[in-house]
């Protein structure tokens, strides 16, 4: 109450920000006449003048009024579009590194031009990030002529481009592309084999379009580059056969093999389920008599079993995925689009493939990964724009340090948002939706129906066919036609069913898209035909406006109010009339899981009967409270994911920095020599403990260790017999000299140049190989870390501590393996070095995943998360090696001093 009173007196923070930015807009407006009088040449010359002023230590902020005035004038001349004041407001907010919330149809594409132009002047590059390839291509081609007129180059990053074209696109002043492509290019650059192969420059400034979709909806799904791991696809098929025999436990303590936690989107085997699983495994010969599913040797089976169970119980065809061309293709829950080439990780995708009877592709091992949260925080300056960000303002501020500024609309909003209508059953709800659609269709009012899944859109389509209502369906199966269908969704009486936010970024114009119709005539069409099309379009436009504009129907509430607002925002653009209504039932996911008791109680109190709908502010408020609860829950998960990924991010930063330094270095011989001294010192200390007496020395073991690990044959026992004065320090020096001598001989044979090249190639190969193994170990650690909570330990602290220990061990292994490789491999010519390079490239046959993220407490994942079961740890083949027995690797050392140390 006090806050409301203060904001009435002093204005909200948003009002105060807008007041200060409006002063700058007034300065831009004051320059409009002056710049309109300039010739094209004079206007174009401004770009070089601005760059000279920047070189003379003027700041970008000082250039805002003139630079924005130049872009506005260029927009009028090149595109025939003048930036409105609110668009300039948005541009200044973007330049300030904030998020501009602008309603649908307010021209966000044009808003970005002024901020992109200004920030491209220093020559460090600007990235404009969109949600799909179509929008990146469209926006770059649409705005490209404006930038070109002002002397700036434009590049586009598309998914099918070769590295040369990518590099050229990144060297442009302004580069358009999707979030996935920018993220994958960053990871690919950090797997490159030379600096010349890297395509990206330093990450300077990014404008993220649909920022809520990219930085919030997709924040829990990391980008992963992976390579094939050894895994039997036959096992997935064998285990898949058992799944129909398992029964769900319907009530607590009742019969059944598994329970489902819908809130957490998890499935758990009951005690009876464990016994049943073991029984079917025994019958099929996958387990032996007397074995348990939890024996170390059967952990792999358990991993496959859990993946198969989740595939059958939690993942549904035409909701979470579709089957197309003998492949399981994931459907993006936020956009309803298919994601070809993307795969769920950790065996889940293979289990779904087995369930659907398609070809099973091999399981993958992570080679590189990053979350969008950490990728976008690498930019020196970040800004974003969207139609719906205010509900998530707290998260943007907390995680990205981005403030949301709500920009007023150019024309007043006249859309009517009707209250929710709630029914008892889904059947009644669909019947009411069909009646509403028929009414609008009869009156010539266009309708857009938003659904949460392909299944719902196809069900509604079936009902409309029965009623003989002509309509178009836009979902993941038909997104090739997406822009065309959406562009014409505003024609009189048109009925369009769209999954979620498909077609985002394309405006629905009342009366249909005039530009699209004119384009069908071709460039040489006569004037009369064009005039006829314009006249017909105007008639249609007037008819739609008279019928009430575009009517939006929501078939259920999404977990996030923001996604609902996005659907509403398709109507009422630029002051157009329009209306929206959501139809709900107590059988909807959100209502059933999060709000059913409260709402059904309300309905009973209000005396509701079957077939009746309830429309009441209390109900709407109760639903929004349920949504707030889910949003808070999802925010906690994303925050938790970030806290865990920050640990990996620090390590990733160190490794990538080391890689870049290695690739940039001409000569790494000093580094190799320093590493060699440390590695030999550690090895000698295993057999000759520092400060020990000679009776404690294990000379045969040391000789064997040097020979097996580094190929160095030395007679240390002979040295000691010949020189009784040899003590620990001098012995270390003699061994070091012998190592240096052997290495020097190798260098003499091939020459210094080949050796330097080989050292660099070997270091990069070992670094990449060990980093890949480390990522797998980090995955294993993260999967089980939440169990530490049962031991009264803080899982986050334990994860940080153990991840650091793993990282230290990896660094030691890198040093050891580099020296072992350099010492043992025979190099004769440059061709041998090329062979090492070839091996590294072969090991990098990769696949790109935007896979389901795993959080610490997967048990608290949200309704639509796709967290994967834990990976199977390494399972020993054969008998256990005793700690004092020789290590099976052949080093000659005791197991406890060799590979036993890693355990």
UniProtKB/Swiss-Prot annotation:
Primary location recorded for the protein, binned into one broad class: membrane
Pfam families, sorted: P-loop_SecA, SEC-C, SecA_DEAD, SecA_PP_bind, SecA_SW
User: InterPro entries, from UniProt?
Assistant: Helicase_ATP-bd, Helicase_C-like, P-loop_NTPase, SEC_C_motif, SecA, SecA_CS, SecA_DEAD, SecA_motor_DEAD
Q: Which cofactor does it need?
A: Zn(2+)
Top-rank taxon of the source lineage equals Bacteria
**Biological process per Gene Ontology, one example term:** protein transport by the Sec complex
Q: Where found in the cell?
A: Cell inner membrane; Cytoplasm
Q: List the GO molecular function terms.
A: ATP binding; metal ion binding; protein-exporting ATPase activity
Q: Which residues fall in a compositionally biased region of kind Polar residues? A: 856-869
Q: Where is the composition biased (Basic and acidic residues)?
A: 874-883
Keyword annotations = ATP-binding, Cell inner membrane, Cell membrane, Cytoplasm, Membrane, Metal-binding, Nucleotide-binding, Protein transport, Translocase, Translocation, Transport, Zinc
Give the EC class as a word: translocase
The entry's Zn(2+)-binding residues are 887, 889, 898-899
The reply on keyword Cell membrane is yes
Topology with respect to the bilayer: Peripheral membrane protein
Q: Where does ATP bind?
A: 87, 105-109, 507
Q: Which PROSITE patterns match?
A: SECA, SECA_MOTOR_DEAD
Catalysed reaction, written as an equation: ATP + H2O + cellular proteinSide 1 = ADP + phosphate + cellular proteinSide 2
Q: Which family does it belong to?
A: Belongs to the SecA family.
Q: What function is annotated for this protein?
A: Part of the Sec protein translocase complex. Interacts with the SecYEG preprotein conducting channel. Has a central role in coupling the hydrolysis of ATP to the transfer of proteins into and across the cell membrane, serving both as a receptor for the preprotein-SecB complex and as an ATP-driven molecular motor driving the stepwise translocation of polypeptide chains across the membrane.
What is this protein called in UniProt?
Protein translocase subunit SecA
Q: Which gene encodes it?
A: secA
